[in-house]
Structures are given as C-alpha cells and as structure tokens.
Amino acid sequence: MDSEATRGLLAEAARRAADYLEGLDARRVSALPGAAERLAAAIEEPFPEGPSQAAQVLATLDDYGSPATVASAGGRYFGFVTGGALPATLAAQTLATAWDQNAASFVSSPAAAIFEETALRWVKEVLGLPPGAAGCIATGATMANFACLAAARNRVLAEAGWDVDAKGLFGAPAPSVVVGEEVHASLLKVLSMLGFGRERVIRLPVDSQGRIRAEGLPELSGPAILCIQAGNVNSGAFDPAPELIGWARRHDAWVHVDGAFGLWAAASPELAPLAEGYGEADSWATDAHKWLNVPYDSGIALVRDPEALAGALSISGAYLLPSGRRDALQITPESSRRARG
C-alpha cells in the first residue's frame, strides 16, 4: 500500500472511531440486539485464499463489529470496575500502534523503555511507594500479581535455601500463602499458575465488608507470603495493613498488595488514610486501565527489591546483550510486548 492509500485508510479509521465515540451516549450500553449473531454470520467463511481490500476489511470491522461491542468506553457503563479511555490516551495509543515497537528492551525501542520508566516513576511518586522499587507494565492486575508473586515465591524460598530458578518446585519447602476469605479470584488463579495451588492457601476470616480480621492471626513457620487487598472487589474495603504487615514481619513473611483499583486511593488527600501502611509492603499490583482511563490493557507491578523481580523473571541468551538501560524483558513475564508506557 502506498503512502497516500495508507493516509486515506488511517483517516477513514479515525473518522469511524470518532463516530463510534460520539454515539456512545445515545446507544444502549450492552451490545445491540442481534449484533453478535450478525457479526458471526458476516465472517462465517473459510480462510481467504487471496488478499482483501483494506478499506472493505475496515468497513466490515466497523459495520458488524461496533454494534456487537459493549459501550464500556462511555460514561454510562458501571460494570466490572472497567475504565474508559481519555482522548489523549486514545490518541497516544494510535501513535504507539503506528510505531509498532517491541518494548522488550532498550535496544529494540529506546522510546518505549524511557516512556515506561517515566510512567512507573510517576506512579511510585503519586502512590507514595519506594522510589527504588522496580516495576513493569503488564496486561492487567492478573499478570501484575503474577510478576510480584513470582518474585515473592523465589525470594522466600531462596531464604529457605532453595533455588527455584535452578531446581524448580519439586522437593522445595512448602511456603505458607496467607490470603483473606474474600481474596480476588484472579489472585487465586495466579497462585495456581505459580505452583502454589488454589486449595492449600491459608484463608483468614473477614468482617462483613471483606476485610481480613486482624485479631487471632495464626502462627507461621518457614517461608511465608501474605496477600492483602487495597479495595475489596465487592465492597471497596481495605484490609488493615498496619496490623497485618506488623504480624507478617514478625514471621519474616513477604507482603504483597493486590490493589487493582483501590491502591489509587493513596493518590487522593481525602482517601489516602484508607491506604495507610500499604507502602510498607514488599510488592504491589494495580491497574492503569481502571481509574487512569488508559486503553486496555495496562496493569502495573512494583517490587521493593529490584533483584527479587529480576531474579524471578530474567532471561538470558547469546543475542540478548544487556544494554545498561531499562530492558523490560528482564523484569516482565513477557518478552515480546507492546509499548504501554
């Protein structure tokens, strides 16, 4: 496709996108009746043996796809703590898509590395988290929790004399993983992915708002990880961090904060008391595609000790020479990844 045709196609995409956004306040929030069926029927065909016209592909995408979307980008959608996208972030993502960068390393994209490093620094500043913490921008809180708890797993087992990176988990000491009775389902998924299992966690009793009760906490021995919530998904309540973290420190436990939406309370002078003590944890996971209204997907993982994060997620290869700058593939679950900073 020549440059003029490309410009025309991008202009048409921008026009269709603007029309979609302008219509959000007038359309129903859920997909339009019958839209999903019409979309499925429109693309029910074998894999094409020849090329398709780009303009026609775009038209099909919009004409059949847009009515089958949920209006979560609009102001009348209140489901699942789903954010929209501010105009500036939508425009920035459009440009970033045109760049088509692999944000794996500084060498593959200096711009992506610098933007991500700056964005994470700002997040630490506004949330009052340790400036020396290492972090990555992942797909969402699930993978942010994964990155943080991978660091936690490897660190607590290393302190027990077990090298997970070299030996795996077979034969390793069994860490105690402590959560509240109303732990978020995605965190249990992460614990399963990391080899802890969903059913062998220690579940602490909670109050009527889903907060972990700080009285009568059990004694622990050996490697341990405590997961607390900054914002219960059903009530918005915060676990009592000062008491729980104090208990965890007496047992040499790693403390992780699942703060997908609630951790941002720390950025508000009015709401910051809710997040009191959360900055004393060892790792934090949150989302940018909720309160910050950046386009999906964008989760944030931060770990107090950079060596713990790198120790769990680093990669080596003859063609992967360290740049001396931010190489995201050394501290993120993914290697190939889009620019999210």
Placement of each model-derived feature along the sequence:
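Active-site-proximal loop/turn and secondary-structure-junction residues that shape catalytic pockets
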Residues: 183, 232, 261-263, 290
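N-terminal entrance/gating region of PLP-dependent enzymes' catalytic architecture
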Residues: 1-132
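Active-site phosphate-binding strand-loop segment of PLP-dependent enzymes
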Residues: 211-256
